[in-house]
């Protein structure tokens, strides 16, 4: 057996329909598009959300909410990321130096994901309950 002799089992593959290629194809002449009308034309059809001129649902319903600008400059940090920080004190500047958060970041919160292997002091960062328990269990402390 060679790669160039491999072929699928007889009858396991069906030839795809080729619209507009004659009466015998089952999709000849109009190619399954019917006669005339917008949807029969090339490039025809209406845009997403168009309801034939009726005021569409997305315009009938009111706008709501907004995206907080604070969320754009807030980062979530995993416990396992703390291993990449040099030194025993972790604050926003040491996280930026270790490339864990971006330069634009102004706030950060440490979440319980992974585990902390050594005692670290967290300074000026928010910490979730689970992460706080894990840090203190490893001998670390949190300074507000």
Curated annotation (Swiss-Prot):
<dbReference type="GO" id="GO:0019843">
    <property type="term" value="F:rRNA binding"/>
</dbReference>
<dbReference type="GO" id="GO:0006412">
    <property type="term" value="P:translation"/>
</dbReference>
<dbReference type="InterPro" id="IPR030878">
    <property type="entry name" value="Ribosomal_uL15"/>
</dbReference>
<dbReference type="InterPro" id="IPR005749">
    <property type="entry name" value="Ribosomal_uL15_bac-type"/>
</dbReference>
<dbReference type="Pfam" id="PF00828">
    <property type="entry name" value="Ribosomal_L27A"/>
</dbReference>
<keyword id="KW-0689">Ribosomal protein</keyword>
<protein>
    <recommendedName>
        <fullName>Large ribosomal subunit protein uL15</fullName>
    </recommendedName>
</protein>
<comment type="subunit">
    <text>Part of the 50S ribosomal subunit.</text>
</comment>
<dbReference type="InterPro" id="IPR036227">
    <property type="entry name" value="Ribosomal_uL15/eL18_sf"/>
</dbReference>
<comment type="similarity">
    <text>Belongs to the universal ribosomal protein uL15 family.</text>
</comment>
<comment type="function">
    <text>Binds to the 23S rRNA.</text>
</comment>
<keyword id="KW-0694">RNA-binding</keyword>
<feature type="region of interest" description="Disordered">
    <location>
        <begin position="1"/>
        <end position="53"/>
    </location>
</feature>
<dbReference type="GO" id="GO:0022625">
    <property type="term" value="C:cytosolic large ribosomal subunit"/>
</dbReference>
<feature type="compositionally biased region" description="Gly residues">
    <location>
        <begin position="21"/>
        <end position="31"/>
    </location>
</feature>
<dbReference type="InterPro" id="IPR021131">
    <property type="entry name" value="Ribosomal_uL15/eL18"/>
</dbReference>
<keyword id="KW-0699">rRNA-binding</keyword>
<keyword id="KW-0687">Ribonucleoprotein</keyword>
<dbReference type="InterPro" id="IPR001196">
    <property type="entry name" value="Ribosomal_uL15_CS"/>
</dbReference>
<dbReference type="GO" id="GO:0003735">
    <property type="term" value="F:structural constituent of ribosome"/>
</dbReference>
